[in-house]
């Protein structure tokens, strides 16, 4: 079996500072086709992503996978809504409050959209949670 990939456009689909809150670090994208049972969808495609030092998980949406993409400026999950710390006295290189690396799955049988993500625990470990 041969697997190949093809770039759909010449530039990035998500750019730094697409909205006033986003910042410049964009990583960990997870794309889904919005399920038909989601009420009032923003678009056909949802792209979840983060800033590894960010305090919220972001969402972009589009009618076509090629774009144009628009950001949902409030984001979808703030660190304060997660089970992770919002403040810390730790001083290690990676010991800052954050939520990042969204991995989103459509659970058609249960009518759920599950998002796995990670963040910082009180002891400095980084763990995965689900929303």
Which residue stretches match the model-derived regions?
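Beta-rich carbohydrate-recognition and catalytic domains
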Residues: 1-99, 105-131
């Amino acid at each position: 079996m041969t697997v190949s990939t093809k770039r759909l456009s010449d530039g990035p689909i998500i750019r730094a500072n697409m909205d006033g809150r986003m910042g410049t670090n964009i990583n960990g994208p997870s794309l889904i086709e919005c399920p038909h049972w989601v009420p009032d969808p923003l678009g056909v495609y949802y792209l979840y992503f983060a800033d590894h030092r960010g305090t919220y998980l972001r969402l972009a949406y589009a009618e076509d996978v090629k774009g144009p993409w628009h950001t949902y400026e409030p984001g979808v999950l703030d660190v304060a809504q997660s089970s992770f710390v919002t403040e810390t006295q730790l001083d290690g290189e990676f010991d800052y409050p954050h939520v990042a690396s969204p991995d989103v799955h459509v659970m058609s049988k249960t009518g759920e959209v599950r998002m796995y993500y990670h963040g910082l625990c009180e002891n400095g470990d980084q763990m995965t949670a689900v929303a």
